[in-house]
């Protein structure tokens, strides 16, 4: 995303690191874990920064991707992103459990979801883009479903099988939503209505500024 927006190397690194650890930072703030894990152990930030540099360098040498290379790149990014979503979701739940909130199911699910999608939301905000989880294919819902699957299975089996079940649910739901174009319903507002709404917002802003 940062490269497509023509960010320089520093910008690409910041966006890459934000995407990787932003959700975990938000989670730790919510559950009161200080200092946040990303700063206690900077391995994740270092790895994200290194990967960002390598991707930047590869594209700088290769130039624009086209045809099969672009398709392969997009597929690889989708698979890595989906795997990361599942792993971060489980990581978020277990981090919340270790903080002493195991009896708060909602907070556990929230911690899993915010860890999984929070970094992506911050990334989209930084690049002046609508957060993908609000307009794109099912993403946060896949994370929430995977989190619920983990908690359900964890009550009946050991930790690792619960993790695998959660990963499988998140991974499958996310990929199927992309393959079949599943989306949550949206309200389709006609162009004339959009113009009226935009004009009303502009008038309201002008009145406030007067």
Kindly give the residue locations of the regions a language model identified.
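Hydrophobic alpha-helical segments of small multi-pass membrane proteins
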Residues: 51, 109-114
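Alpha-helical transmembrane segments and their membrane-interface boundaries
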Residues: 1-106, 132, 136-210
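Residue-level hotspots within the lipid-embedded alpha helices of multi-pass solute transporters
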Residues: 82-83, 112-113, 117
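Membrane-helix boundary/interface segments in integral membrane proteins
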Residues: 117-129
């Amino acid at each position: 995303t940062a490269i497509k927006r023509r960010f320089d190397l520093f910008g690409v690194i910041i966006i890459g690191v934000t995407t990787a650890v932003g959700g975990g930072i938000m989670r730790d703030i919510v559950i009161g874990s200080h200092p946040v894990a990303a700063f206690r152990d900077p391995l994740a930030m270092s790895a994200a920064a290194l990967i960002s540099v390598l991707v930047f360098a590869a594209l700088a040498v290769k130039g624009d991707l086209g045809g099969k290379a672009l398709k392969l790149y997009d597929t690889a990014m989708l698979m890595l992103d989906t795997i990361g979503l599942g792993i971060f979701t489980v990581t978020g739940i277990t981090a919340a459990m270790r903080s002493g909130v195991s009896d708060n199911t909602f907070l556990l699910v929230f911690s899993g979801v915010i860890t999984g999608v929070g970094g992506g939301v911050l990334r989209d905000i930084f690049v002046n883009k609508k957060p993908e989880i609000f307009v794109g294919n099912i993403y946060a819902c896949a994370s929430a479903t995977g989190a619920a699957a983990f908690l359900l299975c964890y009550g009946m089996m050991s930790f690792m099988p619960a993790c695998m079940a959660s990963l499988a649910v998140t991974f499958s739901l996310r990929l199927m939503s992309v393959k079949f174009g599943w989306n949550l319903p949206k309200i389709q507002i006609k162009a004339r209505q959009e113009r009226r709404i935009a004009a009303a917002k502009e008038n309201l802003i002008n009145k406030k500024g007067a």
